Design a protein with these regions (language model features):
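N-terminal intrinsically disordered/low-complexity leader segments
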Residues: 1-6, 201
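Helix-turn-helix
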Residues: 10, 18-52, 56-60
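An amphipathic alpha-helix signature
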Residues: 12, 55, 83, 87, ...
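Short amphipathic alpha-helical interaction/hinge segments
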Residues: 61, 65-69, 101, 117, ...
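Amphipathic alpha-helical packing segments from all-alpha helical-bundle domains
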Residues: 66, 84, 99, 104, ...
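Hydrophobic alpha-helical connector segments
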Residues: 70-103, 153-160, 187
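Helix-loop "lid/cap" segments that line or gate small-molecule binding pockets
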Residues: 91-98, 107-115, 194
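Hydrophobic/aromatic-rich alpha-helical bundle segments in the mid-to-C-terminal region
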Residues: 121, 125, 140-192
């Protein structure tokens, strides 16, 4: 990575950290520059404003496809064993959410939902829509092949993913990751309960 690209990425990473702690309104360009280790004027060599930094962070997470990050050919091959598939997908999803930047972003997203700032990073509903779309397709596939009970895939999608997001919000919106085992236990318990309600007896 060229020096300029590395500095630009460092500005984004530092800004995400500061925004997630102080909010958009509580973070200044001066503070960002100080943490990056450059003059305040140096920020403007890469971004026109704090708002542009904020929007670029949001766009990065909007465009980061969770599905393409998590779903592999090996995982898709497990669809014929729905319980195993759901468990393994959940493990990969929690691991993805456990990265430092994912933790910071969900905290920032929650902080900015009801802020008085004119800049809105995105709504929780917008953030969850990609996961919903992916799960609609997965449950539609499982239903069509009679691997689970015949239930509206959109309903199944919401019923499956919403508790996982609640677990994420409760346990994974802090910087530390010391509760990962507890998070996984709760997630697996949800998968077991959910699968019991959709499996074909």
């Amino acid at each position: 990575m060229a020096k300029g690209e590395a500095t630009r990425q460092l500005i984004l990473d530092i800004s995400l950290d500061l925004f997630s702690k102080n909010g958009f309104a509580g973070t200044s360009v001066r503070h960002i520059a100080r943490e990056v280790g450059i003059r305040e004027s140096g920020i403007y060599n890469y971004f026109t404003s704090k708002t542009e930094i904020f929007k670029e962070i949001a766009n990065k997470f909007k465009s980061t496809a969770v599905g393409s990050t998590i779903i592999s050919d090996d995982l898709v091959e497990q669809l014929e064993e729905p319980h195993q598939f759901l468990n393994n997908f959940t493990n990969k999803l929690i691991s993805h959410w456990n990265s430092q930047n994912e933790r910071r972003f969900i905290r920032l997203l929650l902080m900015e939902q009801y802020s008085q700032s004119s800049e809105k990073i995105m709504t929780l509903n917008e953030y969850m829509n990609e996961a919903r779309s992916m799960w609609w397709m997965i449950f539609d596939e499982l239903t069509r092949h009679k691997l689970i009970k015949e239930v509206d895939p959109k309903l199944l999608s919401d019923e499956f993913i919403a508790p996982l997001y609640m677990i994420r919000i409760e346990y994974m919106a802090a910087d530390e990751d010391g509760k990962l085992d507890e998070v996984l236990d709760k997630a697996y318990n949800h998968v077991d309960f959910f699968y019991d309600s959709i499996k074909i007896d």
